[in-house]
From Swiss-Prot:
Species per Swiss-Prot/TrEMBL record: Mus musculus (Mouse)
Family: Belongs to the PDGF/VEGF growth factor family.
Molecular function as annotated in GO: chemoattractant activity; growth factor activity; identical protein binding; vascular endothelial growth factor receptor 3 binding
A single cellular component GO annotation: extracellular space
UniProt-recorded name of the protein: Vascular endothelial growth factor D
Sequence repeats: 227-242, 263-278, 282-298, 306-323
Gene Ontology biological process: angiogenesis; dopaminergic neuron differentiation; fibroblast proliferation; induction of positive chemotaxis; positive regulation of cell division; positive regulation of cell population proliferation; positive regulation of mast cell chemotaxis; response to bacterium
Modification after translation: Undergoes a complex proteolytic maturation which generates a variety of processed secreted forms with increased activity toward VEGFR-3 and VEGFR-2. VEGF-D first form an antiparallel homodimer linked by disulfide bonds before secretion. The fully processed VEGF-D is composed mostly of two VEGF homology domains (VHDs) bound by non-covalent interactions.
Keywords of this entry: Angiogenesis, Cleavage on pair of basic residues, Developmental protein, Differentiation, Disulfide bond, Glycoprotein, Growth factor, Mitogen, Repeat, Secreted, Signal
Function as written in the Swiss-Prot or TrEMBL entry: Growth factor active in angiogenesis, lymphangiogenesis and endothelial cell growth, stimulating their proliferation and migration and also has effects on the permeability of blood vessels. May function in the formation of the venous and lymphatic vascular systems during embryogenesis, and also in the maintenance of differentiated lymphatic endothelium in adults. Binds and activates VEGFR-3 (Flt4) receptor.
Length: 358
């Protein structure tokens, strides 16, 4: 009996050992593969952000869900008031709280001014022409356009792609002085086109410089925490998690920022019109409330029908062309019929008379 019990324990321990060995052999491989793919994805995202050539492109990469809303906020200054609206009306998940539209416009303008492009600059004529030291010009420098500005990738430089030559009239002076200064035409290179071009052989992957982080700042292995669209980075778990599992950073006190809609329960954001619009339209004879999208009143009234030279019918909430035999007075104290509509001859004179005495 003891022999059978001992043999059973040995077999059980051997089974546990095999299971543990399998897990230790295959488990880390799976985790390492996931970590490697995550790191590769983060590096690709970082390269895309580094290569962004405009504010709109950067926002499209960093906030791909809301980049059209960002574009609208940049173009329409009136949408800046969305930040001060209530939580249930025209609130955004990212933009409304953390960024200001005017600040984004300033950043965009600064970005555009620093792009690689021909810029007016001052060059020394003698250095440009390679003249000897016994010859100089007055004025010594001229204004021309040369390529300058920043590129969006490492390993490239702003260089000219097309050049023209402009003529400048200058005084050429030679020493020792043997004659009066001579007026001569001088041709100087003027850059008309610029582009960011590589300065040497390019590596298959761009070199990404990283700063050293102290353990107190971040204990996670990745210095960049870019996640897929439907996920967010969790500093405590050191991984990307679904948005439902963790609040947005800095929005713990603003739960309305995590709402799935941008404009409230009754409205949706129209990307073409760059504004919130009601989800369901009202019937043709009703007016829609701009805030809560409720339907109320008639589109037509006594005054509106009068301006159209028609008759207002409250029972159908519409303006009709059919003119009755008696004159009705509009809110402007002008008759709706008698001048603009045809009716029986025997009542026309009465209608015309009623215009003077409604």
């Amino acid at each position: 009996m003891y022999g059978e019990w001992g043999m059973g324990n040995i077999l059980m321990m051997f089974h546990v050992y095999l299971v543990q060995g399998f897990r230790s052999e295959h488990g880390p491989v799976k985790d390492f593969s996931f970590e490697r793919s995550s790191r590769s994805m983060l590096e690709r995202s970082e390269q895309q952000i580094r290569a962004a050539s405009s504010l709109e492109e950067l926002l499209q990469i960093a906030h791909s869900e809301d980049w059209k809303l960002w574009r609208c906020r940049l173009k329409l200054k009136s949408l800046a008031s969305m930040d001060s609206r209530s939580a249930s009306h025209r609130s955004t998940r990212f933009a409304a709280t953390f960024y200001d539209t005017e600040t984004l416009k300033v950043i965009d303008e600064e970005w555009q001014r620093t792009q690689c492009s021909p810029r007016e600059t001052c060059v020394e004529v003698a250095s440009e022409l390679g003249k000897t030291t016994n010859t100089f010009f007055k004025p010594p420098c001229v204004n021309v356009f040369r390529c300058g500005g920043c590129c969006n990738e490492e390993g490239v430089m702003c260089m000219n792609t097309s050049t023209s030559y402009i003529s400048k009239q200058l005084f050429e002076i030679s020493v020792p002085l043997t004659s009066v200064p001579e007026l001569v035409p001088v041709k100087i290179a003027n850059h008309t086109g610029c582009k960011c071009l590589p300065t040497g052989p390019r590596h298959p992957y761009s070199i990404i410089r990283r700063s050293i982080q102290t353990p107190e700042e971040d204990e996670c292995p990745h210095s960049k925490k870019l996640c897929p669209i439907d996920m967010l980075w969790d500093n405590t778990k050191c991984k990307c998690v679904l948005q439902d599992e963790t609040p947005l950073p800095g929005t713990e006190d603003h739960s309305y920022l995590q709402e799935p809609t941008l404009c409230g329960p009754h409205m949706t954001f129209d990307e073409d019109r760059c504004e919130c619009v009601c989800k369901a339209p009202c019937p043709g004879d009703l007016i829609q409330h701009p805030e809560n999208c409720s339907c109320f009143e008639c589109k037509e009234s006594l005054e509106s029908c009068c301006q159209k030279h028609k008759i207002f019918h409250p029972d159908t909430c519409s303006c009709e062309d059919r003119c009755p035999f008696h004159t009705r007075t509009c809110a402007s104290r002008k008759p709706a019929c008698g001048k603009h509509w045809r009716f029986p001859k025997e009542t026309r004179a009465q209608g015309l008379y009623s215009q003077e005495n409604p």
